[in-house]
């Protein structure tokens, strides 16, 4: 384990990580899910009200552990690193199907009275070619 202070290299650390220790913020959790990382988060009376739901989501989806205090982090790390538990969390994280990038344009297209196919084309990956001339 290696503890790092503030860094702009979070993407590199997440690529090398087995799980994420952090707060129950939507950005932190979403990044961890995209990187297929289980999470170890804290939720207590001082947690922002809007972030408490994220802790419930983590528990309900079984994609990590929620601690009442980061004073319990050593125990939490030991628990999340139990092979069977880590495998279950990883399986649950991998099973998430985040389609928001497709669903939001489809909803907007419906609101605007446009065909959903238009919205789907707008988020399709672009093909880039390089000229050799």
Where are these regions (language model features)?
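Nucleotide-activated sugar donor-binding and catalytic core shared by glycosyltransferases
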Residues: 1-133
